[in-house]
Regions:
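Glycine/proline-enriched, intrinsically flexible loops and inter-domain linkers
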Residues: 1-86, 91-114, 118-588
Length: 588
């Protein structure tokens, strides 16, 4: 590449066009998708790769859906070779034959040609409301193998040279429970890839192919240099982190452990998961690309935040990920993987972050409140039609970072906040459930010099039919989200069904029957803390008490700050005694 041929203005324009195009793709999906997960919760992702399967732009979206998708692009290149043409669109959701995350995340890839030369790939991926299988939604804890989890679609053309392959779509949509809704969402994803093609071809026509490709090389070179410089500032050594999920959905109440060793040598870093648990029978197993995505994402959190929107293949080159085959972080076919984005997937990110928090305590990051999802299946009496409902509403808040409290209401750690909560009105319009309570809860955040975001309480009444509920997308009843640098972990979660005066405990990774009139109650732990709680600014503790984030009792026993319950003022003398601080000399 002739570096002198790329001027700063052109480079900036090309680089930002890649980023803005991906965001535009997400906006298209927000406006056109129909299912609740995509349209309201934004469980979608979009990115751009080059003809060598190098990642060029992945500015926003769930970590598991993006950073490892170069494996999918490589698979497509290997499978189709020269049999790729302008107008092709390729569908894939198979974790083992196409390297998807789990079956509900359908991805549509479009090769982008300029004058018959393959230049780029784009991907739009979104969580489908159903993918067939034994239970609606895809989070089925009792599946025997991955084929029981749903329809496995290896990379297959659904458009060829611009012509829709209706027979392929007919086969696919005939194997899901809501074919018309899935059809609309599929076309929305395809439309997003067409937007990307239009924008990139316009860019190439404006600046010329060679100039754009020169800019790509410079983009990769700059991010690699920046990340190597960041790693070089970290003290050489090996740093360890670990985290556990409640169980695998098959062997109940037996934690599944992810263990990580991060080794820093000069300007390179290795993230090694070799000490993690072996592959499990249950559905929490991750495939290699999913593990890679989360390990890379966890690493990026500790680097210069101004790079966050611009990470690409260059950023990834200095980081090596080791995940032994046959483990929960690199499962072998036909292992079930349906619950992996929530359970074990979260722990991969947490273990990576815990290790790097030791390496860089001045950038320490605590984990977020655990996901408290569910998939409820029944019939809506208003329409007589079947429905499947899920939510992120009961998730706890974000974990603290060094220097800042965790965000209130953010969710969830594996998505880094890109997936959002829904709203009460939308839930009640779409589903036969009435939301009775939905609020933050006092004393449900992990304490620290900087505390985590608060936990959440959520209650919903079933005004529909009898049905079923899978809690495969839940975790955190037995295992805490890890804290950092002396902070305290977020509290455990709990849930139950209230039925005819009886409380039925609802645990993660189980199947339950739902009856009309049931009240589903969830209380989630919040994010974990960073730093010793006794070092928290007493004025911030007072504000937390006034704002009802923490109680007077927690303020005194955990934070060691004494507050008068009548005047709501700090008792400084008692506080210094509680904290073991010397008395201040009076001014004479």
């Amino acid at each position: 590449m002739n570096k002198g041929s790329v001027d700063a203005i052109t480079l900036s324009t090309v680089w930002h066009t890649f980023q803005s195009t991906c965001r535009e793709m997400r906006h298209v999906l927000d406006r056109t998708a129909q299912n609740y997960l995509m349209a309201q919760l934004h469980d979608v992702a979009a990115g751009i790769w080059d003809a060598q399967a190098r990642t060029l732009a992945v500015p926003a979206g769930p970590t598991s859906q993006l950073l490892g998708q170069k494996f999918s692009v490589r698979y497509i290149l290997d499978k189709f070779g020269d049999n790729l043409y302008p107008g092709d669109v390729i569908l894939n959701n198979d974790p083992y034959h196409g390297y998807c995350n789990h079956l509900p995340d359908w991805g549509f890839f479009r090769p982008i040609f300029y004058k018959d030369e393959l230049l780029f790939f784009t991907l739009a991926r979104g969580h489908q409301m159903d993918t067939g299988g034994s239970y609606p939604g895809g989070y089925f804890p009792d599946a025997y193998d991955i084929h029981a989890e749903g329809l496995c679609i290896p990379p297959i053309k659904v458009f060829e040279k611009g012509v829709e392959r209706k027979d392929v779509f007919e086969l696919v949509w005939n194997n899901v429970r809501w074919p018309e809704a899935v059809r609309v969402d599929n076309y929305a994803l395809i439309a997003a890839t067409k937007i990307c093609e239009n924008r990139l071809l316009a860019l190439v026509k404006r600046y010329g192919k060679d100039t754009v490709l020169d800019c790509v090389e410079e983009m990769l070179s700059r991010t690699e240099r920046a990340i190597r410089a960041e790693i070089a500032r970290v003290p050489d050594g090996t740093y360890c982190g670990e985290s556990a999920s409640d169980d695998d959905g098959s062997e109940h109440d037996v934690p599944v452990w992810v263990r990580c060793e991060v080794t820093v040598r000069g300007d390179e870093m290795t993230v090694d998961f070799s000490k993690s648990d072996k592959q499990r029978k249950g559905f929490v197993n991750n495939t290699l690309p999913s593990t890679y995505s989360r390990a890379i994402a966890g690493s990026f959190l500790f680097f210069d935040s101004s790079l966050a929107d611009f990470h690409n293949e260059g950023s990834m080159n200095p980081v090596k990920v080791v995940a032994p085959e046959g483990s929960v972080v690199n499962a072998k076919y036909p292992a079930t993987v349906g619950g992996s984005p929530v359970s074990v997937g979260t722990q991969i990110l947490e273990a990576t972050v815990m290790a790097l928090s030791q390496a860089m305590p001045h950038k320490a990051i605590a984990s977020w409140g655990r996901h408290r999802g569910h998939y409820i299946f029944g019939t809506d009496p208003r329409t007589g039609e079947r429905y499947v409902q899920t939510t992120f509403d009961s998730d706890g808040g974000a974990g603290a970072v060094w220097g800042f409290d965790g965000y209130e209401g953010a969710c969830t750690f594996p998505t880094l906040g890109s997936v959002q909560r829904g709203n009460v009105e939308e839930v009640e319009i779409r589903f036969p459930w009435r939301i009775l309570r939905y609020h933050m809860v006092k004393d449900l955040s992990g304490a620290g010099r900087w505390r985590g975001g608060s936990g959440m309480h959520w209650e919903a009444l079933n005004v529909g039919s009898d049905g079923g509920m899978a809690t495969g997308s839940s975790d955190g009843d037995q295992t805490h989200p890890p804290a950092a640098a002396g902070g305290m972990p977020g509290p455990l979660c709990k849930a139950y069904l209230q039925r005819d005066g009886e409380q039925i405990v609802v645990k993660p990774h189980r199947m339950y029957q739902i009856r009309k009139g049931d009240l589903l109650v969830k209380t989630s732990g919040g994010g974990s803390g960073v730093g010793n709680p006794r070092e928290r600014d007493p004025e911030k503790v007072l504000n937390d008490v006034i704002d009802e984030f923490i109680s007077l009792d927690v303020a005194e026993k955990i934070y060691r700050v004494a507050i008068d319950p009548i005047t709501m003022e700090i008792n400084w003398e008692k506080t210094r005694t509680l904290r073991g601080e010397p008395e201040k000399e009076s001014v004479k």
